[in-house]
Amino acid sequence: MSSLIVKELDKSHVDKIVDVFCDAFYDYPVMRHVVGPAVEDYDQCLHTLIEFFVMARVYHQGPLLGVLDENTLIAAATMSRPDESSAPPELLEHRERVWHNLGVDARKRYESFGKAWSETPIIQPHLHLNMIGVRREHHGKGLARMLLDAVHEKSEEHPNSTGVSLSTENQKNVSLYEYFGYEITGQAKIAPGVETWS
């Protein structure tokens, strides 16, 4: 592996970011739960869902970061700014297309996460880390730490941000984030076997 760098990304990198996240989150509880157990083409549904998540950040002009190994994107992070405005029309239209494709039940399952996340709000303005993912073949190489450091720098640079928030649905990640200095502010059970920590 050559020298790695964290780079600011933009809309032109969406396909590569989605590709990284589809690999990193392939078996992630949120994705499996929202898409549903009986779907015929999980890979395509996962791509549709993750593309929506990434495009939401693009429509809001949120920060996008990536770790590149030469020209190959191997890890990425997407964020929300503390002063983010309401959803633009393009995002609302994209959202309706997504739920038309994934179905009413998938939408309800996703909204159950949104309800849980909204019940543990952080009052102070902050930068929110929406997604952070590393290709599975590159796990254990410190790439998440590189991205988290860059995310923290983004927060420090923003005049209205008092810190960084995130949520995880993988209990193994809780101790990892605590190691990086995060504190649990909320926990909720979404469905049998599916929990979220903020």
Question: Predicted regions span which residues?
Answer:
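Active-site rim helix/loop that mediates acceptor-substrate recognition in acyltransferases
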Residues: 39-63
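Conserved beta-strand-loop-alpha-helix junction that forms the acyl-donor binding cleft
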Residues: 130-139, 165-175, 191-194
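Conserved acyl-donor/pantetheine-binding loop and adjacent beta-alpha core of acyl/acetyltransferases
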Residues: 73-133, 139, 192
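Conserved beta-hairpin
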Residues: 60-77
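Conserved GNAT acetyl-CoA-binding A-motif
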Residues: 125-127, 155-169
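A short beta-loop-alpha structural element at the N-terminal edge
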Residues: 5-19, 23, 27-31
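Conserved active-site alpha-helix within GNAT-family acetyltransferase domains
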Residues: 145, 157-160, 170-187
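Conserved acetyl-CoA-binding loop-helix of GNAT-fold acetyltransferases
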Residues: 131-134, 140-153
